[in-house]
A protein has these predicted regions:
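Bacterial N-terminal signal peptides
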Residues: 6-16
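Positively charged n-region of N-terminal signal peptides that target proteins for export
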Residues: 1-4
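Noncatalytic, solvent-exposed loop/strand surfaces
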Residues: 20-420
Length: 420
């Protein structure tokens, strides 16, 4: 059975099938922007209340659970080893796990399981911080394997590699933006999802210095009119690339106006309709109109905001743009003008690394202590609930079939009752 979900995106409308909307196939969900179209989601829970099941985890991670149908996929660090786990989403039981790589290391909030898997509903692909990239079918059979560091040189990020692949049509788009611990150039590549073959690889040159070339972001997909572009942030700039060739189509500088040598970027670019939102290390967050070519630093700039996030990726529905900083200070901006509608407003004082999710007219914002603040979306600041799992949490929430999936250091939680 199929039903249509109509999303207003500027003046365009897209019909989205239930299959897509009810799954969480990539890090930022079915629409690649932290939004779910689902309704009647849980607002209240605790470690004991409104929990359908929980599965013991061996370690913390920044990777988000990836969900398709009856399967949940997890990038998991277990001591020195990294595995892909496949979990039964109904029972919360481990179905299989496959070895990805040895050589796991921990660096502050980072370990080598930080990249989230991606799936098209038939196969699943997962990257590790050690550079191993593998594809599997849903039974756990390995399709292919790549060692990106062996092929193209050691990663040179100060805190280790953490970018998730972007899956679009027949390919994975993988970025390696680094410079703190290497003189090798940064690059972006397109990999055939069926064979693992590199279809193209392009250098991404910038003038960033010391740690500023390092980027822990994930590529974003920009679609407007008949145009499709891959958006990359890092190295003091944001760029748009032709997915067919990798050619750089446009570039906006200005993400590091003071040429700070420690301006690595963690929060990923956000795309909604024909606008690209590019966070940096707090300021400035830039909003850019799509369609420009060449140097669009000034020509495409719609607005700039001086209180952006460091780690959490923002979320927008095209009308309101929500920012959460690392201390739990929130802003709601007009997505078109950048004007503050509300904020600064502080939610629970803590450190925030998880990215907010927008669904069911609510914002879900989780801090590192495992407390999720649920807020009413829209032009008025209103806290609906605070829900504490009391455990170290870096992962962002995932939503599927009326349930919320939260991954902490100790457990994977399935929250609420399933709605089909």
């Amino acid at each position: 059975m199929r039903r249509s979900l109509i999303l207003a995106v500027g003046i365009a409308f897209f019909s989205v099938t239930t299959t897509l909307a009810d799954n969480w196939p990539q890090w930022r969900g079915p629409f690649l922007n932290g939004i779910s179209a689902e309704k009647n989601l849980p607002s209240k829970w605790s470690a004991e209340e409104n929990i359908t099941w929980k599965l013991t985890m061996p370690s913390w991670t920044g990777a988000t659970p990836i969900i398709w149908g009856e399967r949940i996929f997890l990038n998991v660090a277990e001591g020195d080893d990294l595995h892909l786990w496949c979990v039964d989403r109904t029972k919360g039981e481990l179905l299989w796990k496959k070895h990805l790589s040895s050589g796991n290391t921990k660096m502050r909030k980072q370990n080598m399981s930080s990249p989230s898997p991606v799936t098209d509903g038939k196969n699943v692909w997962v990257m590790t911080g050690t550079g191993i990239l593998k594809g599997f079918d849903f039974s756990g059979a390995e399709i292919w394997m790549r060692d990106v560091q062996k092929d193209y040189g050691r990663f040179g990020l100060n805190w280790g590699y953490a970018s998730s692949p972007l899956l679009y049509e027949d390919a994975l788009f993988v970025q390696v933006l680094h410079g703190m611990k290497t003189d090798d150039p940064s690059y972006v590549m397109r990999i055939d999802k069926k064979t693992g073959k590199t279809l193209w690889k392009v250098e991404r040159k910038t003038d960033a210095i010391r740690e500023s070339p390092d980027s822990y972001t994930t590529p974003a997909l920009l679609k407007y009119g008949k145009n499709v572009e891959i958006v990359i942030t890092g190295g003091d700039c944001v760029t748009g690339h032709d997915p067919a060739t990798g050619k750089e189509l446009w570039r906006a500088n200005g993400l590091n106006p003071d040429n700070n040598p420690a301006y690595r970027i963690v929060a990923s670019p956000v795309v909604f309709a024909d606008v690209v939102y590019a966070p940096t290390r707090v300021k400035p967050l830039l909003a850019l109109k799509a369609g420009g070519r060449g140097d669009v630093t000034e020509s495409s700039k719609l607005w700039a905001f001086g209180n952006g996030p460091d780690v959490p990726t923002p979320v927008t529905d095209g009308k309101y743009f929500y920012v959460v900083d690392d201390r739990g200070v929130m802003w709601c901006l007009d997505a078109k003008t950048g004007e503050a509608i509300w904020g600064p407003q502080r939610i629970k004082s803590a450190t925030y690394s998880s990215s907010p999710v927008l669904a069911d007219d609510k914002l879900y914002v989780t801090n590192e202590e495992g407390l999720t603040t649920v807020l009413k979306a829209g032009p008025k600041f209103e806290v609906l609930a605070e829900n504490n799992l009391n455990d170290y949490t870096l992962s962002s929430p995932a939503i599927s079939d009326g349930q919320i999936f939260m991954r902490t250091a100790q457990y994977l939680y399935c929250i609420g009752k399933r709605v089909r």
